[in-house]
């Protein structure tokens, strides 16, 4: 079973810095570009990579990521084809963890056991399922455990103490703290209150804590990385890819490299 997530965070602890986790939508704008982006991101500064699974009803996604999902679906994205891109990536990149992020419906239609088996075989390390609360994970959890896939939990600022405890106990790999309320990319994260929230969350979990939603600039990455274990940048990167369609890989690599400069503690 893969230990890439644990090994990556342990390495970064020794280097005294947080991880940079860029998010891209699988198949946005097409398979060839996604494969090239995945290939380029580690050298640009990505420590882990999140790949979005496009879905036709993405309730937590803002307009930037919704549009990316629609482009991906129009390009022929399926869960099976995205796993193929991960397999292709893993043939060249043995150590960079890959996290899939999406909604439960595509996984359910694929088949819970089949998904976990195929994802682990392709080289996926963890999964974030936006709409699967701990109370409903029962049918999926045995297959996740058997395959070694980590179930990364989202924790919101609105989560009460008991909810945070339940989510933390259900999580593996790391936990993902949502820095703002609302949909992805809707507004900028308010870093002045984030540190207090993260310090409080550490009382409930020993897992690394990633912070995402609303982080758009290198300055924000620098600020948030000082008190978190990882920083996720999604909508801002997806927007760069959309605005630089013909040079998406070059533009995305430059943007990620700029973000990575702020990660030294």
Identify the role of each PLM range:
Residues 2-12, 31, 56-67, 77-89, ...:
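Active-site-adjacent beta->alpha loops and helix N-cap segments on the catalytic face
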Residues 31-42, 159-168, 211, 215-231:
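Catalytic cores of alpha/beta
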Residues 149-185:
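Histidine/lysine/aspartate-rich catalytic loop segments that bind and position anionic ligands
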Residues 20-24, 49-51, 98-102, 127-129, ...:
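Hydrophobic faces of well-ordered beta-strands that scaffold small-molecule active sites
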Residues 199-207, 216-265:
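Alpha/beta catalytic cores of nucleotide-metabolism and tRNA/nucleoside-modifying enzymes
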Residues 22, 41, 49-52, 119, ...:
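Conserved, mostly hydrophobic/aromatic
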Residues 46-56, 124-128, 133, 177-185, ...:
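Glycine-rich phosphate-binding active-site loops on the catalytic face of alpha/beta enzymes
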